[in-house]
From Swiss-Prot:
GO BP, sorted A to Z: protoporphyrinogen IX biosynthetic process
The encoding gene: hemL
Organism domain of life: Bacteria
Pathway: Porphyrin-containing compound metabolism; protoporphyrin-IX biosynthesis; 5-aminolevulinate from L-glutamyl-tRNA(Glu): step 2/2
Species name: Geobacter metallireducens (strain ATCC 53774 / DSM 7210 / GS-15)
Record-given protein name: Glutamate-1-semialdehyde 2,1-aminomutase
Record-listed E.C. numbers: 5.4.3.8
Keywords for the protein's UniProt record, in alphabetical order: Cytoplasm, Isomerase, Porphyrin biosynthesis, Pyridoxal phosphate
Annotated compartments: Cytoplasm
């Protein structure tokens, strides 16, 4: 496969953009390759600068549940552009999308629009702190909630130990307010609560961990978090930036029947444009400025083009049978890849929830970050490069989720499974 123009672009980009990319994982560094530069996309297919076509299972890291360039999304945004691209003022479109989100997501009674998932999570945490009057938060190892300082923190040694920065530039004094528990382990949460009684403002969790591969919650885990938070007066935040409108129309909280106090959203609600949102109980959300004292603002929050794309996307997701069809496509792909690995004699551990799935390069069960980190990342990197040569575009990391869209055809899925079998055989 010729990728000479992508190589030229990457060399040029590295001279003017740090690392040559505007988000680190795009550099393909962890898979020992150089990125292909994408120039256009349609349906399930993306096309690079050298005119190579790939079946895409990244989907812009989750937003493209309808596939690329859905004609109704394109048409609606084109019409909206004719009325102006940004006003910095309230619009009726904001109300329309907010009403749709409130109707869809069980925990959300009021919602505030922002421009990214990181904005959503950092604002939700600030609001939880303001509402409770407490400073500390609990997050989980392996869960990613954006690049805000309080969230770039890893666990210290022992339950009572404060978190330590996971990136240069995060002050140690700031990181001490973030406590880290083990995903799918209620006992680790209870130990932190016991050590920091009445200090914890919120617990933030991906209800389905999607940033260490795809790791579903074990039975009772989310229920246990709900009970702990209720008993301790702690705000439970579900980070559904990835799972919202993805694993069900009402997100993971609808799928599992567990209602948090607050929810963060992003990706799908923007229809491919930059949108985030956070919402929850009315009594909490009313503490936001200008109705309350907790400050949050944004120049492009509620951008009319993004609101338009979001509204049209949610309308399409409401069509009869949408999630049933998506579930079948996803099941066929995930089971097909797992079967291809078995036939090739290569061991993997496969997980899937709805249209999110992951093939972990390990023999053992993956249920938290420690078990995910046991994967053979070198073999995954080889597999990734081989699949790319076969025209299959996967996330360039063992610890990312693959996404299926409604645009993926049975032919796409069959081709992907056949390519996977061939690539597993080479390992």
């Amino acid at each position: 496969m010729n990728t000479s123009h992508s190589k030229e672009l990457f060399a040029k980009a590295q001279e003017i953009i740090p690392g040559g990319v505007n988000s680190p994982v795009r550099a393909f560094k962890s898979v020992g390759a150089e990125p292909v530069f994408i120039k256009k996309a349609s349906g399930s297919t993306i096309i690079d600068a050298d005119d190579n076509a790939y079946i895409d299972y990244v989907g812009s890291w989750g937003p493209m549940i309808l596939g690329h360039c859905h004609p109704r999304i394109v048409a609606s945004v084109q019409r909206a552009t004719e009325n102006g691209s940004s006003f910095g003022a309230p619009t009726e479109l904001e109300i329309t999308l907010a009403e749709m989100v409130v109707a869809a997501v069980p925990s959300i009674e009021m919602v505030r629009m922002v421009s990214s998932g990181t904005e959503a999570t950092m604002s939700a945490i600030r609001l939880a702190r303001g509402y409770t009057g407490r400073d500390k938060i609990i997050k989980f190892s392996g869960c990613y909630h954006g690049h805000a300082d309080s969230l770039l923190v890893k666990a210290g040694s022992g339950a009572a130990t404060f978190g330590v920065p996971d990136s240069p530039g995060v002050p140690r004094d700031f990181a001490q307010h973030t406590l880290t528990a083990t995903f799918n382990d209620l006992e680790s949460v209870e130990e932190l609560i016991c050590a920091h009684s009445r200090e914890v403002a919120c617990i933030i969790v991906e209800p389905i961990a999607g940033n260490m591969g795809t790791v579903p919650p074990r039975a009772g885990f989310l229920e246990g978090l709900r009970e702990i938070c209720t008993n301790e007066g702690i705000i439970l935040i579900f980070d559904e930036v990835m799972t919202g409108f993805r694993v069900a129309y009402g997100g993971a909280q609808e799928r599992y029947g567990i209602t948090p106090d607050m929810t963060t959203l992003g990706k799908i609600i923007g229809g491919g444009l930059p949108v985030g949102a956070f919402g929850g109980k009315r009594e909490i959300m009313q503490q936001l400025s200008p109705s309350g004292g907790v400050y949050q603002a944004g120049t492009l929050s509620g951008n009319p083009l993004a609101m338009t794309a979001g509204i049209e996307t949610l309308k399409l997701l409401q069509e009869d049978g949408f999630y049933g069809r998506l579930e079948e496509k996803s099941r066929a792909l995930a089971e097909g890849i797992a079967d291809a690995a078995r036939r090739a004699g290569y061991p993997i551990y496969s997980t899937r929830v709805g249209s999110m799935f992951c093939a972990f390069f390990t023999n053992g069960e993956v249920h938290d970050w420690t078990s995910a980190a046991m994967c053979d990342t070198k073999s995954f990197a080889t597999f990734f490069r081989s699949m790319l040569e076969e025209g299959i575009y996967l996330a360039p990391s063992q610890f990312e989720t693959a996404f299926v869209s409604i645009a993926h055809s049975s032919e796409d899925i069959e081709k992907t499974i056949a390519a996977a079998f061939s690539c597993f055989k080479k390992l």
